C-alpha cells in the first residue's frame, strides 16, 4: 500500500456516513494520500486528523478535478458515497466521474458496503497491482 491515492466524495446526506467510515478506517486511510471534494475533505480532516488534499466542492468542479486525476492515472481508488434518493444539480459531472472510473479501470465504491470491501482489500494488499501499472 505504497503511496496509493484515494478520493473521498460524499453527497450532503452521506457526509456523516463518510466521517464515520473515515474514523473507522483511519489506520488504513492514513497510510495513503487522501483527496476529497471541498466540504467532505474538511470534515474528514477535522474528524480524523488525516491530511486531506482538498479540491473544489463537487458542484463547483471538484468531481471533475478528481476525474482529471483519474484520466492521468494519478488516482487509485474512489469512494463516492452517493445519495441516490436526491436529485443532484451537477448530475452530468457525477456521471462523467463514474464513466472515467470505468474507462480507466479504477475501483469505485458508491455505497458503504462496497467501500468497506475495497478498503479491506486495500489493507490486505489486493490493490498493489495499481503500483505496477503506474
Swiss-Prot record:
GO MF annotations, alphabetized: methylglyoxal synthase activity
Catalytic activity annotation: dihydroxyacetone phosphate = methylglyoxal + phosphate
Listed GO biological process terms: methylglyoxal biosynthetic process
Pfam families in the record: MGS
Entry-linked HAMAP family: Methylglyoxal_synth (MF_00549)
Function: Catalyzes the formation of methylglyoxal from dihydroxyacetone phosphate.
Name assigned to this protein: Methylglyoxal synthase
Species: Thermoanaerobacterium thermosaccharolyticum (Clostridium thermosaccharolyticum)
